[in-house]
Regions:
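Metal-dependent nuclease catalytic cores in nucleic-acid-processing enzymes
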Residues: 176-183, 337-345, 433-437, 482-502
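Domain-level recognition of nuclease-like catalytic cores that cleave nucleotide substrates
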Residues: 491, 495-521
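Phosphate-binding site recognition
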Residues: 1-424, 439-440
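Conserved catalytic cores of phosphodiester-cleaving nucleases, focusing on short active-site segments
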Residues: 432, 455-472, 486
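Mg2+/Mn2+-dependent nuclease catalytic core
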Residues: 166-171, 472-489
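Structural motif
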Residues: 146, 464-468, 500
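Active-site metal-binding core of divalent-cation-utilizing nuclease and nuclease-like domains
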Residues: 136-141, 435-463
Length: 521
């Protein structure tokens, strides 16, 4: 049992404070955001990352509920505590809907706010109803209105791969948001959250002064949990988890970091832990997979198919300009913006001199989740059999026995149904990449450059370095000849580990390994 009451599944700041559950203090960001120039703000973060909680924190702040903030950072910062009328719209319930269903849903959430303000005979169209709500709240309170919109993109995410349906739903949402522009004089503060970044032209047609704080260093830690917050507010829980797992406190911190840390959303961001996985780990006292298994969105899988994503496109470090990943998702040339904004890849490095970023999967949990999600497309529908085989291969490699590892792989592939891509050499490279990526403690790279060419696969274990060259319908001998003729192994001479060369030949008729040759460098 956890030492503290964790707010898993609770996204309401007021409830968390009243029920004395753990709250990671983000109120300094509330003060900073509400005391800066500008009226319209947008924050993009992955699902289950604390966006809704921050939104309800803003709501309690603007409603003047000072008592809820006792002992928090903002208590010493804020002097006025002015109360404003707040309109809060949660669009997360608008998923998987067609045109008529979405229009009814908007009518429903508008009606909830209309009842609060005594509007009994509302307008018909959503934009006119929102305009009337803003006008009524402004006139009855005598103060400017605060509008908070959570998960603004939820109605559109599931159809982002279907252009016609996307255009239809996007027009509905653009119409709904339109009063936010021409009601500016009556608005104190407008804040929208979401996962993805849609272009202002497509959604906020005239709202050209919205400030996107998603990659602003001043708000790097606005969602998620930093290492400093972890150590300061969860120290007792770390010790309890160490006791239960019979490991040291330092080992617990290392495992938490390996599994759930590694997110960066700005150039100079501190390491950010996934809050959902971190709190779930403390609740369950297990280093499990929580965020990924809580629901891989169907839109992501659909888009990966649409863009014909191969595993190495996802589970490999990549250099990119900000415009290549912090970009609108509706017309993206690659899947990178969606992977980044959804939290499946993140910023790992920023090189200021040349203004470019290095992106990669954030941590072990996400890497394993993505790898398993790709198994059906590149190995077999039987994910369990694949992961079990990968585990046995890892045990063989831990014994420095590549012969046994390849025998296990050959036996396993003999049970896998024939694949339509079996006549492409690249298919086998991707298949091996997926299987080896399941060996979580190892590093696997493909198409690694050397002075004389590129190695198909480089596998780095705790003790050894393996160079794999793949051939299709040729021979393992020709694969080994290529390794030796091009001296691939010399590129890795300073690795400090024994190097093993592996030539593998696949048979396109069976989709399996025909033979292999193993040599020490």
């Amino acid at each position: 049992m956890a030492l503290k009451l964790y707010p898993l599944g609770i996204q309401t700041f007021e409830r968390i404070r009243k029920e004395n559950k753990l709250y990671i203090d983000k109120t300094e960001y509330v003060y900073r955001l509400t005391h800066t120039s500008g009226t319209y703000f947008f924050l993009g973060r992955p699902r289950r990352f604390g966006k809704s909680l921050f939104l309800t924190t803003l709501q309690s702040y603007f409603e003047g509920k000072k008592d809820l903030f006792n002992g928090l950072a903002i208590e010493k910062l804020e002097k006025e505590w002015t109360e404003y009328p707040v309109l809060h719209f949660d669009l997360s319930g608008g998923k998987h809907m067609n045109k008529e269903q979405l229009e009814r849903y908007l009518a429903f959430i508008l009606e909830t706010e209309e009842k609060k303000w005594g509007i009994t005979q509302p307008q018909i169209d959503a934009n006119n109803r929102l305009t009337e709500l803003i006008n009524t709240a402004y006139e009855k309170s005598g103060k400017q209105v605060v509008v908070l919109i959570d998960e603004y993109d939820a109605p559109m995410l599931d159809v982002v791969h279907e252009q016609e349906q996307l255009d239809t739903l996007r027009n509905i949402m653009r119409n709904f948001f339109s009063p936010l522009k021409y009601s500016e004089a009556k608005l104190r503060f407008v804040f929208l959250t979401g996962i993805t970044k849609f272009s202002q032209i497509s959604i906020f047609s005239e709202l050209n002064n919205i400030t996107n704080i998603s990659m602003n260093d001043d708000y790097a830690g606005i969602c998620g949990i930093t290492k400093e917050e972890l150590l300061m507010q969860m120290s007792e829980d770390i010790e309890e988890l160490a006791r239960r797992r019979n490991i040291t406190k330092e080992q617990v911190i290392d495992k938490l970091k390996e599994n759930y840390d590694g997110y960066h959303f700005t150039r100079f961001s501190p390491d950010i832990f996934n809050p959902y996985s971190l709190l779930s780990c403390f609740t369950e006292n297990e280093f499990g997979s929580y965020w990924f298994t809580s629901g891989t969105p169907t839109y992501l899988i659909n888009m990966m198919r649409k863009y014909q994503v191969v595993p190495t496109d996802v589970i490999t470090r990549v250099e990119a300009d900000a415009s290549e990943f912090d970009a609108p998702t509706e017309n993206m040339p690659t899947i990178m913006p969606l992977l980044y904004q959804s939290g499946y890849i993140t910023i790992k490095e920023y090189h200021e001199d040349y203004n470019y970023y290095v992106l990669d999967v954030p941590n072990k949990e996400v890497k394993m989740g993505l790898t398993k999600a790709l198994i059906p497309s590149y190995v077999t529908q039987n994910t369990l059999a694949t992961t079990n085989t990968a585990r046995r291969i890892a045990q063989a490699l831990d014994k420095q026995n590549m012969e046994e590892a390849l025998t296990l792989l050959q036996t396993f592939l003999g049970t896998v149904p024939y694949c339509n891509n079996a006549h492409y050499e690249g298919h086998y490279q991707q298949m091996l990449f997926v299987i080896f990526s399941l060996l979580t403690d190892y590093q696997v790279d493909v198409e690694v450059h050397t002075p004389n060419g590129r190695v198909d696969i480089v596998l780095l274990t705790h003790t050894d370095l393996f160079l794999l060259e793949i051939k299709l319908d040729k021979s393992a001998k020709s694969a080994m000849q290529q390794i030796n003729q091009k001296n691939y192994h010399k590129r890795f001479a300073l690795s400090g580990k024994p190097i093993t060369k592996v030539g593998i030949n696949f048979d396109s008729k069976t989709g399996n390994i025909e033979n292999w040759i193993i040599e020490k460098a």
